[in-house]
Amino acid sequence: MTEDTRIMRNTSPEQDYQLATEGSAAWEKRGRAVMPIAGSRAIFFHLPYPLTMDRGEGAFLYDVDGNRYVDLAANMFSLVHGNAFPPIVAAASAQLARGTAWPANNSPQIELAEALVARLPAIERVLFCNSGTEAFSLALNIARGRTGRYRFLMAEAGYHGTMWDTALGGKGKEGPTHLSAPYGDTEAFLAVIERHRHELAAVFLEPMLGSGGFALPPAGFLRAVYEACQRHGIVFVLDEVVTFRLAPGGLQASLDFQPDLVLLGKIIGGGFPVGGVGGKAELLAVVDPQAPRALASGTFSGNPVTMAAGLASVTHLTAAAIAHIDALAAQLEAGFKAEAARHGIALFTRRVGSLLAYFFYDPGTGPIAMGSRPDSEVIQRLHLAMLSEGLFPLPRAAVTTSTVMTEALMVEVVQGFGRALTRLRDFGGRD
């Protein structure tokens, strides 16, 4: 935010926030007249109201009141190169001038597919769609077409999009089409697979829980589940929508097996809506229109603008770029802990590459459900305090870095985090 805003100290972080964001409040009121939450994504909603942005440039976002924020959310980790990254802007703009979509093939789609097949070890063929949720649906259709079965198994605290069944499965609730088991519990997963082996078309797992507090599985868990799937003809699907940014070949490159299918999204669209399903050629063949066992289609699937932007994004996410964003996140982790210690606060963190989550209690190593966090009230107030210091994290206490950021900027972020903690202390938000 502006310097004047940053030195503001009123009765609470909430009041500081409201005084600095009157334009966002006005847009919230206007939006509520025609939309349920003045937006289309619940993930960024927070009280008293979310910000309304005007533009993004590089590492920064600018709201309608003219306040500047360091973008530590990257549109849910998807903008790995920051906002309006020039190579992506150039690629998308050039394609826009030639057309946005048509009922025929396009060369950028094939070029992006070639890049992904060359880069990701488990992918021999790939299909594109328009979101991670669509990618899940497409993969499930492929698995059903291949196996003739209907149900799927996922992890409690897992996330594979916003379909009703996946939302329930993430909460550990069984339904007519889905089953779930605790993430990392090999015995529980194998028991469900054995009990329902004749019903299961697919098992979906993340190599790291993107919405579950960045929890990593215990050694051998993924392989044991994969081997059980192989024994019973069940399609094993690895969800790398979030984790592709963590290594040149995604986290799948560190596994000692290759999943049957892989879900992709976020960074492969260069900031445009995108999803993808890749995997073994024999599995993807079930959507061949000459002998279809499952349907793959969509009005904007594989559109040339998204594909051109995605190719630029993937091309510029080199091993060196990934090392850079990982180092910046490590710098933030150390800095956040140091600032918390200076304030006499115990801060716990989880960092996987360029993804960092922070907690005001010891979360252990297992999955985290945001709704059950004992520090949720503090996190909500800290979020507003960070916004008032010109920092834009995810409301659920997570941040990420982008390739356009620098070490010097991370120093500023750490300083802003320290000032946000001071705000909480001054107004009784954290003892």
Predicted regions and their residues:
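Conserved N-terminal phosphate-binding loop of PLP-dependent enzymes in the Aspartate aminotransferase
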Residues: 2-431
